[in-house]
């Protein structure tokens, strides 16, 4: 990646800066990291901007490897019709949302989408159960019993479901998140 064809143009860098919460240096680092996932012959700027990287490759990045929501993160940010790969721009969008400079509203919107496992626009009992399992692990020693899970989800809904419809919508989720001072600082990925 040392040749003249291996750096993003000033115009493209400026456009990416305008469209994301990332600095020029962060965009260049993101491009370098993305290119490292590509075969050597696809590492030119032109190729890298038109090539998709499989989730398997993206998930090999140490920054995502240990995240319990890594598959959902990739699915939410993928623009692929089959939702199984990321383009460089998808990768930039992901890093932008998880950057320190992304707004709390943007972060909470994407957190909601990541936690909405069935993509129906609400967090229902099944979504909340999957969310808890991702956080606690699904091993015998960490998995909650059915009664513990029911009690926990009842408590979450009691606290969060303002309109009492049995689900948490985006505005209810954002209301809860707004009362969590650590959310924005913990919802980040740094390359």
From Swiss-Prot:
Subcellular location: Membrane; Cell membrane, Sarcolemma; Cell membrane; Apical cell membrane
Binding site for Ca(2+) 1: 116, 118, 120, 122, 127
Effect of gene knockout: Mice grow normally and are healthy; other family members (CIB2, CIB3 and CIB4) may probably compensate for CIB1 loss. Males are sterile: spermatogenic cells can complete both mitotic and meiotic divisions, but postmeiotic spermatids do not develop normally and sperm is not produced. Display increased bone marrow megakaryocytes and circulating platelets. Mice display tail bleeding time increase, impaired thrombus formation and angiogenesis defect after ischemia. Show compromised tumor growth. Does not affect auditory function.
Keyword Iron: no
Lipid anchor positions (N-myristoyl glycine): 2
Entry annotated with the keyword Ligase: no
Pfam families found in the cross-reference section: EF-hand_7
Record's GO cellular component terms: apical plasma membrane; cell periphery; centrosome; cytoplasm; endoplasmic reticulum; filopodium tip; growth cone; lamellipodium
Residues that span the membrane, as ranges: none
Key words of the record: Angiogenesis, Apoptosis, Calcium, Cell adhesion, Cell cycle, Cell division, Cell membrane, Cell projection, Cytoplasm, Cytoskeleton, Differentiation, Lipoprotein, Magnesium, Membrane, Metal-binding, Myristate, Nucleus, Repeat, Spermatogenesis
Stretch forming the signal peptide: none
Residue ranges annotated for the EF-hand domain, each copy included: 103-138, 148-183
SMART domains: EFh
Protein task: Calcium-binding protein that plays a role in the regulation of numerous cellular processes, such as cell differentiation, cell division, cell proliferation, cell migration, thrombosis, angiogenesis, cardiac hypertrophy and apoptosis. Involved in bone marrow megakaryocyte differentiation by negatively regulating thrombopoietin-mediated signaling pathway. Participates in the endomitotic cell cycle of megakaryocyte, a form of mitosis in which both karyokinesis and cytokinesis are interrupted.
Assembly mode: Monomer. Interacts with the heterodimeric integrin alpha-IIb/beta3 (ITGA2B-ITGB3). Interacts with ITGA2B (via cytoplasmic domain); the interaction is direct and calcium-dependent. Interacts with the protein kinases PLK2/SNK and PRKDC (via the region immediately upstream of the kinase domain). Interacts with PLK3; the interaction inhibits PLK3 kinase activity. Interacts with PSEN2. Interacts (via C-terminus) with F8. Interacts with NBR1 (via C-terminus). Interacts with FEZ1 (via C-terminus).
Domain notes: The EF-hands may also bind magnesium ions in the presence of high Mg(2+) levels and low Ca(2+) levels.
Further facts: The binding of either calcium or magnesium significantly increases the structural stability of the protein in comparison to apo-CIB (calcium- and magnesium-free form).
Protein name: Calcium and integrin-binding protein 1
Organism annotation: Mus musculus
């Amino acid at each position: 990646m040392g040749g003249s064809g291996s750096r993003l143009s000033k115009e493209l860098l400026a456009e990416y800066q305008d469209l994301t919460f990332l600095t020029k240096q962060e965009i260049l680092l993101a491009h370098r990291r993305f290119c490292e996932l590509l075969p050597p012959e696809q590492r030119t700027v032109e190729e890298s901007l038109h090539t998709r990287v499989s989730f398997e490759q993206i998930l090999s990045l140490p920054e995502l490897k240990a995240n319990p929501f890594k598959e959902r993160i990739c699915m939410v940010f993928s623009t692929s019709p089959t939702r199984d790969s990321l383009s460089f721009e998808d990768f930039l969008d992901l890093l932008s949302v998880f950057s320190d400079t992304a707004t709390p509203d943007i972060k909470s919107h994407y957190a909601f989408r990541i936690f909405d496992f069935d993509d129906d626009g609400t967090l229902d009992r099944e979504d909340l159960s999957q969310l808890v399992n991702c956080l606690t692990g699904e091993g015998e020693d960490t998995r909650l019993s059915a009664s513990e899970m029911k009690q926990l989800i009842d408590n979450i809904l009691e606290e969060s479901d303002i309109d009492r419809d049995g689900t948490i919508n985006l505005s209810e989720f954002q209301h809860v998140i707004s009362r969590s001072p650590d959310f924005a600082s913990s919802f980040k990925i740094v390359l």
